[in-house]
Design a protein with these regions (language model features):
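Ferredoxin-type iron-sulfur electron-transfer modules and their immediate structural context
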Residues: 1-135
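Short acidic, glycine/serine/threonine-rich loops at helix termini
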Residues: 110, 150, 171-174
Length: 174
């Protein structure tokens, strides 16, 4: 119960010949096992470490109930990019840093569980968007820029994302 479930990866002899994602993600069984490590703390220190305040014990409890769509809905209330943030967010310096389980062993793999939920949910989100005909530019196509662009688009703005690192911008309709 105390041992963190490690994520499977592609064999190095295979991955050095392609550009596939190295980490394979959790299986259902692995996710349930890792989720069972969550202590569901009342003070929720992990949430305090999350920049977007995801209800981490809430979504993990839904994984324990095998209700992936509801776990996704909980995450989506705070984050529009769970598939991205579950992969690239530095959880070890944020939510996982404050996980009580980490005092005596490794913290719960919160980011890996978020990725699992994003990769395995079957629900779709539909927004009723009323265009306001106001154009907005967002500078930077990292997680913060894309989250900002998504939120603005949902609010009806015509958003153009610009990236300065060798890209010409994502000037399509967001």
């Amino acid at each position: 119960m105390n041992n963190r479930v490690e994520m499977r990866t592609i064999d190095p002899n295979i991955r050095n010949k392609n550009f596939e994602e190295v980490s394979l993600g959790y299986s259902n069984e692995e996710a349930l096992l890792e989720a069972s490590r969550c202590l569901n703390c009342k003070a929720k220190p992990c949430v305090k470490g999350c920049p977007v305040n995801i209800d981490i014990p809430g979504f993990i409890s839904k994984i324990k109930e095998n209700n992936i769509n509801e776990a996704y809905n909980i995450i989506s209330k705070s984050s529009l990019l769970p598939a991205i943030c579950g992969r690239v967010c530095p959880q070890e310096n944020q939510c996982e840093k404050y996980c009580v389980r980490g005092v005596k062993s490794l913290p719960v793999a919160i980011g890996r569980l978020e990725r699992y939920v994003a990769d395995n949910n079957t629900c779709t989100t539909k927004f009723d968007i009323i265009k306001n005909n106001i154009k907005v530019a967002v500078i930077g196509s990292g997680p913060a820029g894309l989250s900002c662009a998504s939120e603005l688009a949902i609010m009806g703005y015509d958003v153009c994302v610009f990236e300065g690192r060798g890209c010409e911008g994502i000037c399509g309709r967001i």
